[in-house]
Structure formats: structure tokens, C-alpha cells
From Swiss-Prot:
PROSITE patterns: DNA_MISMATCH_REPAIR_2. SMART domains: MUTSac, MUTSd. This is DNA mismatch repair protein MutS. It holds the Pfam family MutS_III. Residues 845-855 have a biased composition (Basic and acidic residues). It comes from the Bacteria. InterPro entries: DNA_mismatch_repair_MutS, DNA_mismatch_repair_MutS-lik_N, DNA_mismatch_repair_MutS/MSH, DNA_mismatch_repair_MutS_C, DNA_mismatch_repair_MutS_clamp, DNA_mismatch_repair_MutS_core, DNA_mismatch_repair_MutS_N, DNA_mismatch_repair_MutS_sf. The keyword Lipid biosynthesis does not apply. This protein is involved in the repair of mismatches in DNA. It is possible that it carries out the mismatch recognition step. This protein has a weak ATPase activity.
Length: 875
């Protein structure tokens, strides 16, 4: 065969690869997924596996690498996390079937799935406590919308989303993949950290989208789900089209779409989410975030629900009160709460198990998860009292009515089923008599043969009769030649069929033995086939009740979250907030949940603080001054987090909290350079501040820290001053404004609703002690030099700083001209005063003796004696 000849197998590979150009192709060959050409080079490097070669193509070696099927999911996860997409081509027949078409026929293969970051369903590829969202952004004329789905749980939602709102929404959802029309350029999408997938404009066609959605949900019109705009239909249609492409026609079990309104949740932009560390700490990861500090959930769906609530606190006052009422009820029922949480700990992730069953990607353990989850649901429902809050009552209604399915799964499945259906062994003994007999033949073939042999001995009366086996005859009955006449005569000859006569033995068979032989030889395959048949039937039985099971799973997640909030409130001494539609914001003894948790580990108490922005209908601003390290930023953040927790339905870390409904939370606390986009720290700060001033409404809660610090003093003061005036006059919102510009404290006497507050410090013998107490009033000093000293700056720098500070403060008390003269006279560029000369080191006795020695005057004997004398001085 020449190098240019393409083998049938390689021709098939190239054809499949051409149909999936943007993905690494996992090409099934026996027990391995093989990769070739460029795919092999990319995968070998990404997976750190050996790169080999297999034959030639057009004169060049064909690069090849492979991964075993049993370990494929781990390799898949690595590739997905590194940004690759993977097309999986499976063998659709066994080699024996292929050979029926000809000796050189290739086993038929098809891509059964395209694995992408937003379309994962396996537990090994997913984070159990986080959603895995796939988003689609669509624009039609002057309308735009964002749709998102988690195919591992069946959630589908959509909202109107003008382009300026896209970044905040993506920050809220944190999707793994975003679908856009191929002509749309979104270079900045990398900031969100998700994969960007362009689709053809046809995928976003709204007319086709409506038909696809109606077919998916089996309805004639979508009106019962809501009145969707063309852009919303377009976004949802693109999602469904992409899922059809990646799942190769096996669409996931999506629930009817939920249309979220823009005003339904508290608006929080990307910068604020980052600054408040709601679900992710600034250092990256979950540890150190609000989510990690408050998560007491005991189920994966409950944890995902908690993240959704913290990311999207509601503005529905009735819903807030309903959730808080349920939490209050469980705080007052400790025994019931603990029993519920004990049951919930045994609830598996039914949502994801159900999704895998719908995609025909499930194993027996997914069915066992449904069984265990529904059984615990029944137990919880039976334990709950008749009198319960409305939210709990509604949840309980969805937990019952699954007795028949639970009984079926109990009878059908073993207690601990294997991971994969192909391994068998998951159908319980006694569920199917035929399967039991087949397994008995497979596992106890010798015993069955011995039992049949005993029966034949009894019938024939020949004690030496044996049932034997060889590769030519298979199973046969053997007697000695002395019994041949008896066996060949009626009535035995009617049952026993002569097979062979040898030199001393005669061999027979019977219909029963032939059938038994066939059953034994096929028992293994037949047992697997029977189990697969039962698996398919059980899968159908579960999917027929998918809607009810999904509602039960969501209800269990709700109960988990309610009980988690109640447990948090009791153990952390949190209080129920009073939420109404006023403009109040009064917090007594508020605490920062994350900082308090960190301090507790070191045995340090957290200093609680009050905050009162309740001034009726007028704007309410606290202007906070005080030194760095005193706790201003912590105070700002803790009040924003208290508002967020309250509207998420949780009790809050305070002695008392009265909060008028908050529509938006904005935070500008800390900034850093954005080198990739050519923006300095000051520019980043100004962009974030501009977003706040342009968007905050009169129900917003705004926290601002050190506005204007990144530029010259007078420029910074001017910007901070004007920003505060704008918040007061135009935005008219509730705000906490921390600054080092003490000149701004004069605004408290000029603007109604602006009050001064300061963080208390104490000086003791030249040191500054931070009390971390926020009090009304203004700070008289910044204590910057003292903080610098605590940070470890050299003593010469601290002394020089004090000199310059004293001169500048003296100039403040003089006229402007005198002040400028003092600044001009300061030797600002003179070298720092030299450090004091070190004291002369004390001379040792050895050194003194050495100075007295004249080497040229010493004899050898004297030199040797001197060495001993010097050594004695050392001791």
C-alpha cells in the first residue's frame, strides 16, 4: 500500500472530523478513544500523555494519542477546563456486524455528543454546589435579551437585556459559555471568564425559535408561559438549537421558561459583586466570600439555590416576608429543624440525575438517587406538622404522591447499584424470575448440570451415568458400553438421543440438555440484556413522572435553604430584619459575617457598629472619616451585605435591622490598574464611579471609599466633593461615603441628610490603637504616619515624614502665601538624615593579644606556645 493510500478507517475518521472542525475528536477504537493529526498533538500536550504515530498520510506520519474509555471523563474535564470542545464518536455496531457487510468493512461510527463548557451533565465534570449555565444573547432591532439554561438541572430563564446590562447580568450568572450571533464582536467577554461560541444568524431566527420551543414543550403556543419579545424568543431558540446540535437530537429535560423582569431583583453590577466578594473572594475561589461564610446547606441543590438567592436578592416585599417567616418558624422549632436537616443530608442530587436520565446518559446510581430522594421527601412530608408557614406548606405538597415509584425502584434495584448499566448487577434478586434463573445458570452452571445428572440417573437407573463437556460435542450424557442396549431401547431411546459411540462409552443428549447448554452459554449476555430491558422500563417510568419529581427536588432545595438560614441565625445570633417599603436603613450592632468568622478563628472579638440612614424621604448620607486600618471599608461592606442578606430571605448579623426596600447596591471600594485595557487605577475608579452616578436611583444603597485618591490632592478633593453633592442632589439615595479629605466634613452643615461619622482611635505613648468603633462626628487627623510606622517603614523615613507633616500643618494655620513659602523652603529632595553611627564594637581578648604580637620576632617554639595561649583565650 502506498503512502498516499487512505485506509477505510482513516477515511471514516477524516469524514467525521470534517463535520466537527472546531472540536477535538474522540474516535472510539475498542476500549480507547483515539485522536489523530493536529488533534493528537493538541491533546497530548494538554493532557500530558504520550504522542505516538500510526501509519502515514500523504507521505507524513500520522500523529496519534489515546485515552482509555474507563478514564475518559477525567481527560474530558481537563480539556474542557483548558478551553477545548470535544466531539465523541462512538462505535454504533460491533465488529462482527460490520464483517457481515464484507471482510474490509469499517465499524460504523457516529458523533453522539459534542462536549462544551456549557453542556456538561456528568457529576465528575461539574461542581456539585454550583450551576453550570449556558447563555445566549440576542438582538433584534432595538430589542435585546439574554437567555440561560443549566441542562444538568433543567432550568431555563430569559430576561430583556440591553447591551449595557449584559456585563452585570453575566457577572450575576457566571456562565460557562455564551452563544452570540457570529457577526457580534464581544472582545470584552473575557472579563466574565466564559467561553464565547458564535452561531449563525439562522440559529437566532425568532420565527423558527418559536416553533422549536413549542415542539420542545409540546404546546401549540407559548402564551401560557408568558408574553415573550422577539429578542427573548430569539435567545431561547438559539439555546435550544445549540443543545440540539451538541446533544445530537437528545434534548435535555428543560422546564418551561421563566421570564425574569428587570425590576424583580436587586441590581448589582460586576464591580460591586467583586468588591463585596459575594460568591467569590478577591483572591479567587470560594473561601473568604459571603457565600462560604453563610452556607449551611446540606444538599447540592440547596447550595445552588443559596448562590442564586445571594446573586439575585428579590425586590418582592411579599416574597421576602414569606421567606423570613419560614426561617423564623424553623428557628422556633429546633427539634423539627434538626430532624429535617438530618433527612435532607440523605437527599441526593435528583435534578442532575433526572437530567442524565432524560439525555440517556444515566446509570443505575442515578435511579437509586431518585429512589433515595423521593423516599426522604416522603419522610419529611410525614414528619411536618399540619400548621406551617405558607412557603413550607407549598413545598410539602410537592413531596408526596411518589409511593408507587419508590416501591417499584425499591423492588427493582439493589441497595448499592454499580455506576454503569453495562456492568449489570443492579436489578434486585426476586424482581424477575427469568433473570434470576439466567443468573443462576451463569453463576451456578456446574450445580445445575449436577442436578440434571442426578435426575437422569434416577430415570435410567444407571449409577455410572455422567454429563460431560468437550469442545466438539459441547455437553453430552455418557454411559459405559455395557448400558448401551438399555439406552438405545424404548422407552429411554425416546428421550435420549444417540450422539457418538467410542471404544468403551456411548454418548447421548436430550432436548433438555441441549436447551440448558444454550442457556448456560448465553446466560451472561442474556442476563445483561434482561437488565438493560428493565433499565429502559424503569427509565421510562421515572421520566413519565419527571415533572412531579422535578417539583419535589426544587421543594427539597427550598426546605434545605430555609433550614440552613434558620441554623445560621440560631448558631450565629442573627436577627430577623424588618423590611418595608420605607426609606429606612437603621442597623444596630451590625457585623461583617466574613470578617467576624475570620476573627473568631484567632479568638479576636468583632466590634459591632450602628448605622442609621433613616431620614424619611430625603437623601441620607454618612460621610465617614478616620485613619486607614481603622475599619472604614469593613463598615461600608458589612452594611451592604446586611441589606443583601435581608432581601435574599436570611436573618442578618445585627441586634436589630430596619431596612427600606433596596433596588440597587453599588460599591466602589478599592481599585487596581487594568493594564490589559490601558486603564490606570484612577481611571478604573472614575469609570466605576461614573456608572454609579449615572445609574443609581432613589432606592439604591451606595458605598464609596476614597473617591479621588488616585490623583493630585486638590483634584481628588474636588471630584469627591462633587460626587457627594451629585449623590445627594440627583441620585437622592442612601449612601456611606468614606474619605480622607477632612475638608468635606463641612458638607454636613450645608446638605440636609448628610451626617459626619468617624472611626474612633486612641493614642497611647506615641502609638495609635484602633478601636474599630464608628461614632457620629468628624476625625481631626488621619494618623497616616502612625499607620506607616506600624507597617514597618524605616525609622528615618518615619522621622522625615513627621518633619514634613509638622511643617505642612503649621502652614495650614498661616495664610496661603505663607503656606506656599513653607512648602518651597522644605528640603524635599535632600537626602534623608544619615542614621546614627553604630557604636564601636568591643575588642575581644584574642584581638588585643594578636595586636601585641610581632611575628618576625617569634621562634618556632614561641609561635607554637602562642597558638595554645590564643586557643585558651577562646575558652
Amino acid at each position: 500500500m502506498s503512502d498516499d493510500t487512505v485506509t477505510p478507517m482513516m477515511a471514516q475518521y477524516l469524514e467525521i472530523k470534517a463535520q466537527n472542525p472546531g472540536a477535538i475528536l474522540f474516535y472510539r477504537m475498542g476500549d480507547f478513544y483515539e485522536m489523530f493529526f493536529d488533534d493528537a498533538a493538541l491533546a497530548a500536550e494538554a493532557l500530558d500523555i504520550a504522542l505516538t504515530k500510526r501509519g502515514k498520510h500523504r507521505g507524513e506520519d500520522i500523529a496519534m494519542c489515546g485515552v482509555p474509555i474507563h478514564a475518559a471523563e477525567g481527560y474530558l474535564l481537563t480539556l474542557i477546563r483548558k478551553g477545548f470542545r470535544v466531539a465523541i464518536a462512538e462505535q454504533m455496531e460491533d465488529p462482527a456486524e460490520a464483517k457481515k457487510r464484507g471482510s474490509k468493512s469499517v465499524v460504523r461510527r457516529e458523533v453522539v455528543r459534542l462536549v462544551t463548557p456549557g453542556t456538561l451533565t456528568e457529576d465528575t465534570l461539574l461542581e456539585a454546589r454550583r450551576h453550570n449555565y449556558l447563555c445566549a444573547f440576542a438582538e433584534i432591532r432595538d430589542e435585546a435579551a439574554l437567555a440561560w439554561a443549566d441542562i444538568s438541572t433543567g432550568e431555563l430563564s430569559v430576561t430583556a437585556c440591553p447591551l449595557p446590562r449584559l456585563m452585570p447580568e453575566l457577572a450575576r450568572l457566571a456562565p460557562r459559555e455564551l452563544l452570540v450571533a457570529d457577526e457580534r464582536e464581544l472582545d470584552w467577554i473575557e472579563e466574565v471568564g466564559c467561553a464565547l461560541t458564535p452561531l449563525s444568524r439562522a440559529s437566532f431566527d425568532s420565527a423558527s425559535a418559536e416553533k422549536r420551543l413549542c415542539a420542545l414543550f409540546g404546546v401549540g403556543t407559548l402564551e401560557s408561559f408568558g408574553n415573550f419579545t422577539r429578542a427573548e424568543l430569539s435567545a431561547m431558540g438559539a439555546l435550544v438549537d445549540y443543545l440540539d446540535l451538541t446533544q445530537r437530537g437528545k434534548l435535555p429535560l428543560l422546564r418551561p421558561p421563566v421570564r425574569e423582569t428587570v425590576g424583580g431583583t436587586v441590581q448589582i453590577d460586576a464591580a460591586t459583586r467583586r468588591n463585596l466578594e459575594i460568591t467569590q473572594a478577591l483572591a479567587g475561589g470560594r473561601d473568604g466570600s459571603l457565600l462560604s461564610a453563610v452556607d449551611r446547606t446540606v444538599t447540592a441543590p440547596g447550595a445552588r439555590l443559596l448562590e442564586r438567592r445571594l446573586s439575585s436578592p428579590t425586590r418582592d416585599l411579599g416574597l421576602i416576608h414569606e421567606r423570613l417567616g419560614a426561617v423564623r418558624w424553623l428557628t422556633e422549632e429546633p427539634r423539627l429543624r434538626e430532624e429535617m436537616r438530618a433527612s435532607l443530608r440523605r437527599v441526593p442530587d435528583m435534578d442532575r440525575a433526572l437530567s442524565r436520565l432524560a439525555l440517556d446518559r444515566a446509570g443505575p446510581r442515578d435511579m437509586a438517587a431518585i429512589r433515595a430522594g423521593l423516599a426522604q421527601a416522603q419522610e419529611i412530608a410525614q414528619r411536618m406538622p399540619a400548621e406551617a408557614p405558607a412557603l413550607v406548606t407549598r413545598a410539602l405538597e410537592a413531596l408526596g404522591g411518589h409511593e408507587a415509584l419508590v416501591d417499584l425502584l425499591d423492588q427493582a434495584l439493589v441497595a448499592e447499584p454499580p455506576l454503569l448499566a453495562r456492568d449489570g448487577g443492579f436489578i434486585a434478586q426476586g424482581f424477575d424470575a427469568d433473570l434470576d434463573e439466567t443468573r443462576r445458570l451463569r453463576d451456578e452452571g456446574r450445580g445445575v448440570i449436577a442436578s440434571m445428572q442426578a435426575g437422569f440417573i434416577e430415570v435410567t437407573g444407571i449409577q455410572s451415568l455422567k454429563i460431560k463437556h468437550n469442545n466438539v460435542l459441547g455437553y453430552f450424557i455418557e454411559v459405559t458400553s455395557t448400558h448401551a442396549e438399555k439406552m438405545l431401547s424404548a422407552p429411554l431411546s425416546e428421550r435420549f438421543i444417540h450422539r457418538q459411540t467410542t471404544a468403551g462409552q456411548v454418548r447421548f443428549t436430550t432436548v433438555e440438555l441441549s436447551e440448558l447448554e444454550t442457556r448456560i452459554l448465553n446466560a451472561g449476555n442474556r442476563a445483561l440484556d434482561l437488565e438493560k430491558m428493565h433499565f429502559a422500563a424503569l427509565r421510562t417510568a421515572i421520566l413519565d413522572l419527571a415533572g412531579q419529581i422535578g417539583r419535589a427536588a426544587r421543594s427539597l432545595a427550598e426546605l434545605d435553604l430555609i433550614s440552613a438560614f434558620a441554623d445560621l441565625a440560631v448558631t450565629e445570633d442573627w436577627t430577623e430584619p424588618e423590611i418595608d417599603d420605607s426609606r429606612a436603613f437603621a442597623i444596630e450592632a451590625g457585623r461583617h459575617p466574613v470578617v467576624e468568622r475570620a476573627l473568631r478563628r484567632t479568638g479576636t472579638p468583632f466590634v459591632a457598629n450602628h448605622c442609621d440612614l433613616s431620614t424619611g424621604e430625603t437623601p441620607a448620607v454618612w460621610l465617614i472619616t478616620g485613619p486607614n486600618m481603622a475599619g472604614k471599608s469593613t463598615f461600608l461592606r458589612q452594611n451592604a451585605l446586611i441589606a443583601l442578606l435581608a432581601q435574599a430571605g436570611s436573618f442578618v448579623p445585627a441586634r436589630r435591622a430596619h431596612i427600606g426596600l433596596v433596588s440597587q447596591i453599588f460599591s466602589r471600594v478599592g481599585a487596581s490598574d487594568d493594564l490589559a485595557r490601558g486603564r490606570s487605577t484612577f481611571m478604573v475608579e472614575m469609570v466605576e464611579t461614573a456608572a454609579i452616578l449615572n445609574q443609581a436611583d432613589d432606592r439604591a444603597l451606595v458605598i464609596l471609599d476614597e473617591i479621588g485618591r488616585g490623583t493630585a490632592t486638590w483634584d481628588g478633593l474636588s471630584i469627591a466633593w462633587a460626587t457627594l453633592e451629585h449623590l445627594h442632589d440627583r441620585n437622592r439615595c442612601r449612601a456611606l461615603f468614606a474619605t480622607h479629605y477632612h475638608e468635606m466634613t463641612a458638607l454636613a452643615g450645608k446638605l440636609k441628610g448628610v451626617e459626619n461619622a468617624t472611626v474612633a482611635v486612641k493614642e497611647w505613648e506615641g502609638d495609635v490603637i484602633f478601636l474599630h468603633e464608628v461614632r457620629r462626628g468628624a476625625a481631626d487627623r488621619s494618623y497616616g504616619v502612625q499607620v506607616a510606622r506600624l507597617a514597618g517603614l524605616p525609622a528615618s523615613v518615619i522621622e522625615r515624614a513627621r518633619t514634613v507633616l509638622d511643617a505642612l500643618e503649621s502652614g495650614e494655620r498661616e495664610s496661603g502665601g505663607r503656606r506656599q513659602t513653607l512648602i518651597d523652603d522644605l528640603p524635599l529632595f535632600r537626602a534623608a538624615p544619615p542614621p546614627p553611627a553604630p557604636a564601636a564594637p568591643k575588642t575581644s581578648p584574642v584581638e588585643e593579644r594578636l595586636r601585641e604580637i610581632q611575628p618576625d620576632d617569634l621562634s618556632p617554639r614561641e609561635a607554637l606556645k602562642l597558638l595554645y595561649d590564643l586557643r585558651a583565650l577562646l575558652t
